[in-house]
Amino acid sequence: MTREALMSTFDDRENAFENKFAHDAQMQFKAEARRNKLLGLWAAELLGKSGDAAAAYATEVVKSDFEEAGDEDVFRKVSGDLGDRATEAEIRGKMIELMAVAKGQLMDEA
């Protein structure tokens, strides 16, 4: 194999890894946004919201994730709004459960 061919192979591998990384990051972002929407709909039901009010609340939950990196901003939003309607463990458990649901939905759509 010539030096040029070898370098081309390395460049191809590098591009493939970069593309996979970008795709994985995009899928994680979509999964988190979907999870947050589902969490918002779940919390909206506990708050007695339905229809457009539930959808609007779910959008608020999705937007709350842009405050800081990680899930704590979403947890704080939902926990603060729910008050004593759900425990910390229930909310965090629901976040984990709904992440799996969100990833499954995205895989089904792909």
Region spans (language model):
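A charge-rich, low-complexity, intrinsically flexible signal that marks solvent-exposed coils, linkers
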Residues: 2-110
